[in-house]
Amino acid sequence: MTNEYLAPFVDELFNLGVREAVFSPGSRSTALAMLFEEYKKYDTYVNIDERSAAFFALGIAKAKKRPVVLVCTSGSAAAHHFPAVLEAKMSRVPLIILTADRPAELQFVGAPQTVDQTRFFGNFVNHFENLEAPHIQKQSQTENFWTYPRKVAQRAVLSAISPLSGPVQINVPLRDLLVPELKSENYEKGRSKHAFKFYEGQAQVILPFDEALLSGKTLILAGANFDKDYSEALLKLAEQLKAPILADPLSNLRNHNHPLVIDSYDAFLANNDLKTQLKADAILLFGQMPVSKRLQQFVAFNNEAEFIQVDPALDYRNPSLTTTTMVQSDVLPFASSIKKVNSDSSYLEKWQNAQEKMRQLLEKVTYEESPFEGRYVQELQKHLEALDAQLLVSNSMEIRDIDYWWKKADAKVRILGNRGVNGIDGTESTALGIATTGKPTVLLTGDLSMLHDLNGLIVGKTHELNLTIVLFNNDGGGIFHHLAQKGVPNFDYLFSTPHGLNFAGLAELTGLDYHLVSGYADFGQQFEASLHQSGIHLLEIKTDKDLSLALHQKYTTYEN
């Protein structure tokens, strides 16, 4: 399967309207040239000089006003494309340049016809991407071998024509054997049930969705967003469609005790029988994909659904590789364009019933006496939901604790997080930046995140900012107890990383008001007091990683 994955790439480009391919002869680009030619539907052209070939392709694209593929071998060949790439960029002509390349193991070792082709054309392309051979570890990943190259093709075409037309470079590292197996059936592999579509602007957003939305099995995924208009628009849309909204905690839709808002889904989507019952015909994604890994797995499992991503920037935000339609629109105009439909309510009821059953189990944690993050999150919500406050949640385990235990309720508190790249760095600094608004501000963080940004506390003292820090201290990386690394050799040393540091001493060093929480009642008293006092307050809650894992499993196992 050395280069068979390129056949779906060739097929997808054609499906998206590409009709011409221009080649210059070369060994490393053999598979690309042969697969385009064997497809039989492209108008193909061969030009022995890469510079001339590039301008020839430019002329086709300029005249026909659509993307044209330009293929070259590795080494200096791409350099001869540069003048035409510059012209395409400045005159906004769509070109898709496929630069064949040597694989990683032949880079920087003196292999012939090998230069660093990463971002070869610099800022003069709209988009750059490597099309690597997909790696398959197990049978369940075979589908991605054929789906992934189609997604690269979709991004290439989309970037070549939107928002402004221009050139795109797709670098294609290829290993021997370079001559492909020409199997006609490979072109069809990885095709979605729904042809990929994208819509620029806001005028046509309703057109591709009527049939799927009318089926009644429509699911809305609400990713991170902190605007009030976002929540109101999605609630309006859900009411029109009678569709459940799976609300990420950072969507702030859990501030609405609305029957269409679904929480606790990360827990019950672990049940395979229920997952099958909840499969949708259409999935609408707003914002980035929610934090729940089980939800992402559900989306991949639900790969025959029409997956519609609504985003003003047309950014790909679906790591499950199942997006079938992209709509360039903000939430409000999209929601306003959808007309009220008569849909079957049974699909919605399945989600509501699953949530209710899960809620009954999760609420039993209120009787838990052991120090457990789940109950402390519920206690935190109880004290915050009536306030016009701001809660920043650190990454790693804390955002997942919020995802599990923060239930929907009519509230004002805004939940924020740094989910762009999901790092644990800069947490205290971000919280103090948020605190400059003057509203009551709380940071929920873990011990490693806290240690990562101790220097950030200095600005809070300098500028006399007010912040309450709720610290879950399990002496290391507790998230790894929930992941595949649990139990591997040297687990504590490599992953759990117990540090044994004294946060009382660190608080004294940084000038924080410190309190070691002795129980749930004590937490409530100290937390309320901190909100009415100036300065930075640190409430440390000590937990045990193994006990937390056991309690998490106890309270989140959904059974039929």
Swiss-Prot record:
UniProt KW Transmembrane keyword: no
Swiss-Prot/TrEMBL cofactor(s): Mg(2+); Mn(2+); thiamine diphosphate
Pathway given in the UniProt record: Quinol/quinone metabolism; 1,4-dihydroxy-2-naphthoate biosynthesis; 1,4-dihydroxy-2-naphthoate from chorismate: step 2/7; Quinol/quinone metabolism; menaquinone biosynthesis
Matches recorded under InterPro entries: DHS-like_NAD/FAD-binding_dom, MenaQ_synth_MenD, MenD_middle, THDP-binding, Thiamin_PyroP_enz_TPP-bd_dom, TPP_enzyme_TPP-bd
GO biological process, one term: menaquinone biosynthetic process
Catalysis: reaction(s): isochorismate + 2-oxoglutarate + H(+) = 5-enolpyruvoyl-6-hydroxy-2-succinyl-cyclohex-3-ene-1-carboxylate + CO2
KW Coiled coil (keyword) present: no
Cited SUPFAM superfamilies: DHS-like NAD/FAD-binding domain, Thiamin diphosphate-binding fold (THDP-binding)
Keywords: Magnesium, Manganese, Menaquinone biosynthesis, Metal-binding, Thiamine pyrophosphate, Transferase
Pfam family of the protein (one): TPP_enzyme_N
Cofactor: binding comment: Binds 1 thiamine pyrophosphate per subunit.
GO molecular function annotations of the record: 2-succinyl-5-enolpyruvyl-6-hydroxy-3-cyclohexene-1-carboxylic-acid synthase activity; magnesium ion binding; manganese ion binding; thiamine pyrophosphate binding
Domain of life: Bacteria
Top EC class for this record: transferase
Record-listed E.C. numbers: 2.2.1.9
UniProt record similarity statement: Belongs to the TPP enzyme family. MenD subfamily.
Subunit structure: Homodimer.
NCBIfam families membership: menD
Protein purpose: Catalyzes the thiamine diphosphate-dependent decarboxylation of 2-oxoglutarate and the subsequent addition of the resulting succinic semialdehyde-thiamine pyrophosphate anion to isochorismate to yield 2-succinyl-5-enolpyruvyl-6-hydroxy-3-cyclohexene-1-carboxylate (SEPHCHC).
Descriptive protein name: 2-succinyl-5-enolpyruvyl-6-hydroxy-3-cyclohexene-1-carboxylate synthase
Organism: Lactococcus lactis subsp. lactis (strain IL1403) (Streptococcus lactis)
Source lineage: Bacteria, Bacillati, Bacillota, Bacilli, Lactobacillales
Name of the gene: menD
